[in-house]
Amino acid sequence: MKLHIFNPENDMALASGSPGYTPPANIRAYRRRHWELPRQWAAPEDIVWDGESSLAHLFANDADALEICPWGWSPALVHELELAGVPRHRMPDREWLGKLRRLSGRGSTVAVQRVLGIDATCCESLDDVLSCLSQWGAIIMKSPWSSSGKGLMLTDNPNWQGWVRRILRQQGSVVVERLLRRRQDFAMEFWMKDGRAEYMGLNLFSTDAHGHFIENIKGSEQEKETMLLSQLDNPESLDGIRQWFVERLPLLAPWYSGPVGVDMLITPDGHLHPCVEINWRMTMGMVAVLGQ
């Protein structure tokens, strides 16, 4: 039996690192409205927490039989669950949470991108960013920490240099990647457990010109794969990168258990960009896959 928790503020809570982190009012309201979302993939016997009820009675007897499955882990969620009556030893310790925080930053994705031959780097000054712009011609800039789909900037925004200075001041660096035109956005969803990664399925979605999520594209796994293969100049690359992540994700984090979503895209000329983002938590893509 599992205890499911929908905490959509997880990215920023993890970035904060503070047990006392408080999400913005609109995010708190969103969580209250949608706390039942995990029912879409939960088993009938599972429990979905409303974010308010005491949980102490669930751990009074046979506590180890109940698996805690949040949208994502952070020190703030651990603190919240402690206040609700969950024993501290049933949750990740400080060392595990620290490793997850480092892994979840966009700087860790850059390390994977470089192995895959993708033009991406972490810049620690505006001059570094300008150098990337000169070298690559068109770039997308990302804050190392932000909520999902946020923290992105393009040079067509007249205030982009001020944005870079602010992110450098607040977070110490800015992630810069060569900007690619996109024909199709999609993600591969994986589940990690016991040092192994299992491929779960594909999620296709649409985005705006700045890469912000708009909506998922519905279809069976076979229909989605057929759609992608028809757009690729090298169809074999899809299976190749799927196997690459099955093998490499456990090497990146052998201690991690839970969902992993890898965002990818196909360019107008059919080239596969195999790693746009890596999300070490639940995603709406995984929700779509589990709901099939």
What residues fall within each predicted segment?
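ATP-dependent carboxylate activation and anion-phosphoryl transfer catalytic cores
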Residues: 197, 235-292
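A conserved active-site cap/scaffold subdomain adjacent to cofactor or substrate pockets
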Residues: 203, 210-254
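N-terminal-proximal low-complexity accessory segments that begin disordered
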Residues: 2-39
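Conserved N-proximal alpha/beta basic substrate-recognition cap immediately N-terminal to
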Residues: 27-43, 48-134
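Extended active-site and interfacial segments that coordinate phosphate-rich ligands
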Residues: 29, 200-223, 281-283, 290-292
